[in-house]
Regions:
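Glycine-rich phosphate/ribose-binding loops and adjacent secondary-structure elements
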Residues: 3
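Catalytic cores of histone-lysine modification enzymes
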Residues: 6-108, 158-163
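C-terminal SET catalytic tail plus cysteine-rich post-SET Zn-binding segment of SAM-dependent SET-domain
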Residues: 105-164
Length: 164
């Protein structure tokens, strides 16, 4: 099977071409979380274990010296996936959409992985409970507090807001 080669600095040759596995499942809209900006929403009903969304990104080696990115997800000990600064808006990149899912301490999805037919190994969001059409998709970012951004540390400290 041939995959589109994803270089370290190039997320996709076709960054505005929707992924056929994902775009019938979710859409991006204004988040219901006041300070979050955009969010990811269900376009169909999901049951526990269903594939909800996909996250493709540039491939890079994990490093504590790199600039912090809220869009970087650890795939394994040797690989991170990141959405570059110039690809974070949906008018710049919308091939996959999981990077638009907001954080919650009581999420309706969890992280997963799959071998995608177009991109190879990618991160996924899998339903942890039933999700209804129109419901916002959330995931626990699970940041290590030693490297987490201030907003996340604040949420941990007060776990009554920020998606509890």
């Amino acid at each position: 099977m041939r995959y589109l080669l994803i270089a370290e600095y190039r997320i996709s040759r076709t960054p505005l071409e929707p992924d056929s596995l994902e775009h019938q499942r979710v859409e991006v809209r204004l988040s219901t979380t006041e300070t979050a900006g955009e969010g990811l929403f269900a376009r169909t009903d999901f049951t526990t274990g269903d594939l909800v969304s996909i996250l493709n990104g540039t491939r890079c080696s994990p490093s504590l010296q790199d600039e912090w990115s809220d869009y970087k997800v650890n795939f394994n000990t040797g690989l991170d996936l990141d959405i570059p600064h110039d690809m974070r808006r949906t008018d710049q990149y919308c091939t996959t959409l999981a990077h638009k899912a907001n954080h919650s301490f009581r999420p309706n999805t969890r992280w997963g992985r799959m071998d995608h037919p177009r991109f190879g190994l990618v991160v996924t969001l899998l339903a942890v409970r039933e999700i209804s059409v129109g419901e916002e998709i959330t995931v626990n970012y699970n940041y290590s507090l030693s490297v987490a951004p201030a907003w996340y540390r604040d949420c941990v400290a007060r776990q009554t807001q920020c998606g509890e």
